[in-house]
Amino acid sequence: MSCNNNGLAFFPENFSLQNHHQEEEDHPQLLQDFHGFLGKRSPMNNVQGFCNLDMNGDEEYSDDGSKMGEKKRRLNMEQLKALEKDFELGNKLESDRKLELARALGLQPRQIAIWFQNRRARSKTKQLEKDYDMLKRQFESLRDENEVLQTQNQKLQAQVMALKSREPIESINLNKETEGSCSDRSENISGDIRPPEIDSQFALGHPPTTTTMQFFQNSSSEQRMVKEENSISNMFCGIDDQSGFWPWLDQQQYN
């Protein structure tokens, strides 16, 4: 949409100038009304009065108990020593005790209360630091003990594995030893069991009698029976955990 000079023909030539002068005349009127609303006091006075509304309620104090704006009073060494000594007797401050300390030390009761409050906070902080150091030492000692126990556990596990690996070899050696003992026992039993009387008769050159021959035959048959029994016992000693049927030899000597 475009504007041209033909549109201005509807308005008088002094229209814009009149509006400009009217705006300039209206501004002083507004300022006068604003000053009338505030009254005779200046705007700075009103701002200061607004800021002082909260200050009239509660009085503010600094950390040492003095009012804001007043010069801070620092405690001397005697006052500090007296307060420390009294704090050691009891960290709880009652109203009567607070007033007595304030009169004795020449301080305000609020200063005494704030000092006790700060001193309790410092004592709690120191106690927490001590507890932390103690717990830290306990943790470190337990950690070292845990490492030692883990090392011992690993060694024991290695010993158990070594013993498990040795068990099959030891069982084989035991089987061999049992077999050897059984064979040695059978050899000892199957030795010469001929009676000494017969040996002495042959050594002297006397011919054996009929009774002697019968005894010798009986002894030889008994010897064969012992050998057969020993052979059977050797067969049983050589077998480990095997079940089966073993046929007995025909006992022809009894027929």
UniProtKB/Swiss-Prot annotation:
Induction trigger: By gibberellic acid (GA3).
Keyword DNA-binding attached: yes
Tissue specificity comment: Expressed in young leaves, in the adaxial domain of leaf primordia and the rib meristem. Expressed in the styles of flowers and siliques.
Example of a GO cellular component annotation carried by this entry: nucleus
Keywords noted in UniProt: DNA-binding, Homeobox, Nucleus, Transcription, Transcription regulation
DNA-binding region: 68-127
Chief location category: nucleus
A Pfam family hit: Homeodomain
Keyword Transport: no
Family matches, as InterPro entries: HD, HDZip_class_I_plant, Homeobox_CS, Homeodomain-like_sf, HTH_motif, Leu_zip_homeo
GO molecular-function terms, A-Z: DNA-binding transcription factor activity; DNA-binding transcription factor activity, RNA polymerase II-specific; transcription cis-regulatory region binding
Localization per Swiss-Prot or TrEMBL: Nucleus
Region annotated Leucine-zipper, chain positions: 128-163
Residues in coiled coil: none
GO biological process, one term: response to gibberellin
SMART domains noted in UniProt: HALZ (SM00340), HOX (SM00389)
PANTHER family per the UniProt record, alphabetical: HOMEOBOX-LEUCINE ZIPPER PROTEIN, HOMEOBOX-LEUCINE ZIPPER PROTEIN ATHB-23
Role according to the record: Probable transcription factor.
Family to which the UniProt record says this protein belongs: Belongs to the HD-ZIP homeobox family. Class I subfamily.
Protein name from the UniProt record: Homeobox-leucine zipper protein ATHB-23
Species, as recorded: Arabidopsis thaliana
Primary gene name: ATHB-23
